[in-house]
């Protein structure tokens, strides 16, 4: 099985979902899978970095794209790298704030569809939306729910999970 996990950032020890993805990738590699990681909106780097990250005894191929890169550049670099890697599965590790500073990644579904056209999708929803509170939070929560529905509609994942009860 050849799989790419896509998350916001992959700075070791600074991004919980990135750390989770790295540990999961290492566990799958240990079982014989080929796995790579893509940080599509990395807050901890400038530019684009093609490297490896180490988890235990495993070296994991990584593409990190800085958050300040244009959407077009992020899409083209990610698509080129994914096409070279040629994974059977793409796994989006979704946290709204990982892909947009205000937690409203409106274009994420369209962007992911462009980089992963014709591939099988899995989505892991680590956080769904902010808890309702004041009027502003209620509006953000409604918008985040709409974004999630759009994301599912655009990617049509074969599998979706959440870690929330």
Please place each PLM-identified region on the residue numbering.
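Conserved alpha-helical elements of sugar-nucleotide-dependent glycosyltransferases
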Residues: 13-27, 104-108, 143
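Acceptor-binding helix/loop patch of EC 2.4 sugar-transfer enzymes
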Residues: 119-146
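Hydrophobic anchor at the start of a short beta-strand
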Residues: 3, 34-36, 121
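Short N-terminal targeting/anchoring amphipathic segment
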Residues: 64, 79-105, 119-124, 157-162
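N-terminal strand-loop element at the rim of the active site
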Residues: 7-8, 12-13, 26-85
């Amino acid at each position: 099985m050849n799989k790419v996990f896509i998350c916001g950032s992959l700075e070791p020890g600074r991004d919980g979902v990135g750390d989770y993805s790295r540990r999961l990738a290492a566990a799958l590699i240990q079982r014989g899978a080929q796995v790579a990681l893509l940080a599509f909106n990395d807050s901890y780097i400038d530019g684009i970095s093609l490297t490896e990250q180490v988890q235990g005894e495993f070296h994991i191929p990584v593409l990190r794209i800085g958050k300040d890169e244009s959407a077009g550049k992020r899409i083209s670099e990610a698509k080129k790298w994914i096409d070279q890697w040629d994974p059977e599965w793409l796994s989006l590790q979704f946290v709204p704030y990982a892909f947009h500073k205000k937690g409203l990644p409106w274009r994420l579904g369209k962007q992911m569809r462009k980089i992963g056209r014709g591939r099988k999708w899995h989505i892991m929803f680590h956080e769904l939306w902010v808890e309702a509170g004041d009027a502003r939070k209620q509006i953000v929560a409604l918008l985040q729910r709409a974004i999630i529905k759009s994301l599912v509609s655009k990617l049509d994942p074969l599998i979706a999970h959440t870690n929330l009860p």
